[in-house]
Amino acid sequence: MAIDVYWGSGSPYAWRVLLALEYKRLPYRSHLLQFSKQEHKSPPMLALNPRGRVPVLKDGDYVCFESLAVLYYLDLKYPKPHIFGSTPEEGGVIMRVICEYQAYIEPHLMNIVRAIFDKSPQTRGANPLRADQITADMHAVASEARTIEARLSKSDWVVGETFSAVDMVIFPGIQLLRRALERPEARELSSRFMPVEVNYPALGRWLARVESLPGYDRTYPPHWRAAAAPSAAETGQKPA
């Protein structure tokens, strides 16, 4: 029985799950939901996930949501290839680095992304990118990116010698940040991070390495291909 995955274009959390499914070469049915139409909050979706967020994975009668929970489930149910390590020690390091990313990078990264993409009436016409908080967020991201850069200067992947859950967690966030910093209004802010290939060469090589994985194109946000900047409604959901 095929796995059903419900996701939205541009959601870094849904992207994690798609990367895992492709890496494990698991057959799945893709259900792309439109954030602009609030399809993720429709009655059928709320029946699967009362929080109305993506990703949601349905495997037979079993329903799983929250992206890390989905990755963990997939690795237990379909263990080859492992994405949480093949030993307790490897798994411990992978989980530790994921926790570090979620505690020390992701909140700052998402603050920046939302400030750039936010088109709400309350902030339209303002310049939130010059706020002290956003500057501090960018400083924090740049500092932590150097930690990831140091890891990747010693290994092809963030932890160990194989693609793992930690790569799946971090990669979509970095790609979303890059997309946000390409916006003209983010030019001054972006100099602290962009171009990635110059400021963080090992990180840049890692991004290219992930992009070359089999099945990667099927995980790429479809609306990004049109080169249209996403709105807050498309990218602004909280972690799932």
Tell me what each language-model feature is:
Residues Y220-A240:
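Acidic/histidine-enriched, glycine/proline-rich intrinsically disordered or flexible terminal extensions
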Residues R29-H31, G160, R218-T219:
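A local structural micro-motif
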Residues F35-S36, F163, R225-A226:
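Positions that flank functional sites
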Residues M1-T135, A240:
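GST-like domain detector, emphasizing the conserved glutathione-binding G-site
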